[in-house]
Amino acid sequence: MVKKYLYILAVAAFAFTSCINDESTEGGDGVSVISLQTPLNSTYTLNQGDTLKITPTVLQSNGKQKLTYEWEVNHKLVSSDTALVYPIQNSGTYTGRLRLSNGQNIQIYEFTVNVEYAYTKGIYLLAENNSKAILSYVPTEGVNKEFHLDVLASNNPNINFGTPCSMAWSKSIGSQTNNILVIAAGNPSTLYQLDSYEMLSVFQTPVNEKVIQVEANSDPSSSKVMAITKNNLYSLGLNTTTLVSQTSRFTNAVGGSVTFASYMTPWWRDDLFYAHGDAYFDNAHGALLASAIENTAVPAEILKGTFTGDTLVGMGSVDKQRKMALITCQKSSGTFYFTYLFPGYYSSSADKRIAANVVYRIAMPSTSGIANGSVVRSARSKNIVYYTNGNAVYAHNVLANSNFPTTALFTVGNSTEKIVDMAFSDDDNLIYVATNDTSASMPGSLYCYDTQTNSLRWSKQHITGRIVKALYRNK
């Protein structure tokens, strides 16, 4: 008798269990089982600020029942709509889940959301639009990103950036390079330190005069940028608002006030791969100035008397940054000079020092295309100095001595455009040329040329406001 009751109880329990399975997962007679016509992706990758969009097609095996949707991202319910349309502002990796139910069957689908930084490799154009600074992001070769006209206002709605002055990449203490962007804007200027992956202003430092140039200091042990004004040089420690004047080093050297040119050029030691000093130029005295990086033995002025009476057109480092090239204009005669020099090695041990010397200083002929206002940039890993005249680009190999070009290497865009800046890829094989066309409502354009063939790779015309500076970012 006991065995009979145990048998009946076992049969009943089995039947009850089967009913639960039929209703929840298996889909027996009359149960409508849920499935997806196309499986969800295992991973959805998008850029920061983009909208995650998933539109599944849901199938039911035995008639259409009313469906309920529950979309979760990062363990939070974000939608109950049939399709997920969800903007994601923060980068990172998140778990996603879709829960579907029709009252008879429940299905759960999981996926991963990978949100990448929106602003990475590419060209950044600091420009003026409606009397305010904007920062345009132009993705470069092989970068699956979108062009942004202005990444400043959208990420900093409560900041009124003034007219643009300059900008520079730098780094934060203990972190990777190029993750801090310093922008100078306004007159008098403010220095804005931005987290360059999200373009959020994290520090603001007022300067009581107009900044004409911002450059990253070359000292690897000290994260700071240099702000150049007409008569002063300041250092700004990153992740701080500490602005320190560095001017007295140079006024003491030249015996009076200085008028800084808007250039800074580092040079490296012959035997090591880091900076030995940073060079500046004083237009008031015609002096090549130096800021010590490796040690304090670096003098404040190099090759005294060489540039007396000259103003700087532009300068840059060449020969893997071991030497320097300067183009200057002698104020009294209007003659342009190309000076190729070794800036010296200043060891802390006097017997190991190597004096600076001029390799050559040659007057540039009128046929060379040089002019006051020319943009001068150097391919640092090579021996080539590029300079501009209007929309034309010229190039001089420093090893060619007095054999200056008489025709342009190439011309950019239309005759109404004027080149305002040039930037190089890390290997110097690509040169990005920024122009302004005052006849256009959006004057700023960008062109990419191959420096091996001098051919145009691509162009993006009239994409931004009046460009002030262009920077290349490698990742």
Functional labels for PLM-detected ranges:
Residues 112-141:
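An edge-strand/N-cap motif at the start of beta-rich repeat modules
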Residues 96-100:
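Hydrophobic/tyrosine-rich beta-strand signature of extracellular beta-sandwich/beta-rich modules
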